[in-house]
Regions:
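Twin-arginine (Tat) signal peptide motif
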Residues: 2-10
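Exported/periplasmic ABC-transporter solute-binding proteins
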Residues: 3, 23-52, 56-58, 63-74, ...
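Bacterial N-terminal signal peptides
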Residues: 11-22
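Hydrophobic alpha-helical segments, principally membrane-spanning helices and signal/leader peptides
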Residues: 10-11, 61
Length: 259
């Protein structure tokens, strides 16, 4: 039986190597387009899927999501309604250094019928007003307490709190359904049920600094794709989408210079 020539052997080796390279490249390509899991604040429920509809999203109270990530939940990206929680995760080595990706403001919402005739934040001190807020561990709950402190209304308003919810959407739902007379929510959330609630503005001087932070979760097996998602959120198109949903620019514009 004739032996195969060196040329044939070399050709076979080259073909095998080419096949291996193709398979590896295919696997790498698949990884670069992997679907990631984004844990995001409830207030981002409507906008994030519009920025990138191809990802898997878990929305909820930022504090709850942070606790789940701490316990090993399979998140690739964490987007919080404050900077405190992602900074805490970063300090523990559980996520990358967070960056601010948007800002927001708070408002008071009341049912369209407004049975208690609430017209300002000060009206929340009226006897019998049923106020619903988010819990103090939830970013919007912490911001609410800051507003009341800034307005020197903490004790006179908190006595009317009848329920503390786990995220901003739960607060909004109770007011929209008429189960409460008023609630503190983000201005962006109020717009989602404009046909069911009226909005009462919080004075600008009483507004807290509401910044949203985003980071890559350390345990993620898709860090490249997670970073690409964050880049998409920070991109010109991503920021334009955030603005279209009522969020504020990630960097507060400098005040105009006096002429």
């Amino acid at each position: 039986m004739p032996r195969p020539s060196h040329r044939l052997l070399l050709s076979a080796v080259v073909a095998a190597l080419a096949l291996t390279v193709a398979l590896v490249a295919g696997q790498a390509s698949a990884r670069s387009n992997a679907q990631i899991t984004v844990y995001a604040a409830a207030s981002l429920t409507d906008v994030f899927p519009r920025i990138d509809p191809g990802q898997k999203y878990q929305f909820g109270g930022s504090n709850t999501l942070a606790a789940q990530i701490t316990l090993g939940a399979p998140a690739d990206v964490f987007a919080s309604a404050n900077m405190t929680l992602p900074n805490q995760l970063n300090a523990r080595g559980l996520c990358s250094k967070p960056v601010v990706f948007t800002r927001n403001t708070l408002v008071v919402v009341v049912p369209k019928a407004n049975p208690k005739n609430v017209r300002s934040v000060y009206d929340l001190t009226k006897p019998g007003v049923k106020l619903v807020v988010a819990g103090p561990g939830v970013p919007v709950g912490s911001y609410t307490l800051q507003i009341l402190k800034n307005m020197n209304l903490t004790s006179s308003v908190t006595k009317n709190v009848v329920s503390q919810e786990t995220d901003v959407r739960e607060v909004l739902a109770k007011v929209a359904l008429g189960e409460a007379d008023a609630g503190f929510v983000y201005s962006t959330d109020a717009k989602t049920v404009a046909d069911k609630v009226n909005v009462i503005k919080v004075p600008a001087w009483a507004q807290p600094k509401v910044q949203y932070g985003i980071c890559v979760v350390t345990r993620s097996n898709n860090k490249t794709d997670a970073a690409a998602f964050i880049a998409k959120v920070l991109s010109k198109a991503g920021q334009a989408r955030m603005l279209s949903y009522g969020f504020l620019p990630r960097v507060k514009p400098a005040p105009a210079k006096k002429q």
